[in-house]
Amino acid sequence: MNMKEISKVVDLVRESNPLVHNITNVVVTNFTANGLLALGASPVMAYAKEEVAEMASIAGALVLNMGTLRPEEVEAMLLAGKSANVNNVPVLFDPVGAGATSYRTEVARHIPAEIELAIIRGNAAEIANVINERWEIKGVDAGAGNGNVVSIAKQAADELNTVAVITGEEDVVTDGERTIVIQNGHSILTKVTGTGCLLTSVIGAFVAVEKDYVKAAIAALTFYGVAAELAAAKTVEKGPGSFQIEFLNQLANTTSGDIEKYGKIEVI
């Protein structure tokens, strides 16, 4: 799997304009929609239990994000996820803050038990808590811990029968057999709320057009990281507000050629 092959997935997303159904959180809804539009995907945010199953059935991908967790949204996620499974629509799950509270952890473990996932994406602490491994977490954005990230990712992929994506200073993608580390990105992403949540939805757009989910995730993470690097280079003296605007620009403007030039991946 070379960089040229990976970079072509970006062009495929833009040519296909996939519909990505998001059941996401109130903090990031606008940013997620704008990010997907900038990339070239078509976002829809449908939450009502009366329509989520139908909407999920016609989407290219379904993204479930439990950032601002409420019981009615959990019900909607389960309805949408089961419909997606029946209709062969890939489901991505972002277990935001798993481990922070008992309710949040319970939901984070219940959803993968009920729904077949194409991708689970979170920081190391979140993924560890989904599979009931001890890992310290403080708040929904915490990711620091003392475990082995690659080991946790492989364990999650095996136990949940999915592709596990753990993001941090470096990003890990694995299906339990193939394991790749992506080394693109920029620390200023942590200063803008919703960049992780948007990333999961961007992976959804890539998964909608590339059925090798490992390849799709690698392509999405590399694209996202390169776009962040290019945006940071243009706004380094200005701060996170300017970065956020420029990042949306780079989601629209970063090309497959940029990915070939700047992408950094390592197979381990």
Curated annotation (Swiss-Prot):
Leading EC class: transferase
Positions in coiled-coil regions: none
Keyword ATP-binding: yes
Binding site for substrate: M45, G194
GO terms (BP aspect): thiamine biosynthetic process; thiamine diphosphate biosynthetic process
Reaction equation(s) it catalyzes: 5-(2-hydroxyethyl)-4-methylthiazole + ATP = 4-methyl-5-(2-phosphooxyethyl)-thiazole + ADP + H(+)
Keyword Protein biosynthesis: no
Sample GO molecular function, one term: hydroxyethylthiazole kinase activity
EC number(s) per entry: 2.7.1.50
Metabolic or biological pathway, per its Swiss-Prot or TrEMBL entry: Cofactor biosynthesis; thiamine diphosphate biosynthesis; 4-methyl-5-(2-phosphoethyl)-thiazole from 5-(2-hydroxyethyl)-4-methylthiazole: step 1/1
Xref: InterPro entries: Hyethyz_kinase (IPR000417), Ribokinase-like (IPR029056)
Protein keywords: ATP-binding, Kinase, Magnesium, Metal-binding, Nucleotide-binding, Thiamine biosynthesis, Transferase
Co-factor requirement: Mg(2+)
Pfam families, per database record: HK (PF02110)
Disulfide bonds: none
Residues annotated as binding ATP: R121, T167
Role summary: Catalyzes the phosphorylation of the hydroxyl group of 4-methyl-5-beta-hydroxyethylthiazole (THZ).
Assigned protein family: Belongs to the Thz kinase family.
HAMAP family in UniProt: Thz_kinase
Cited NCBIfam families: PRK09355.1, thiM
Protein name, as recorded: Hydroxyethylthiazole kinase
Species assigned in the record: Bacillus cereus (strain ATCC 10987 / NRS 248)
Name of the coding gene: thiM
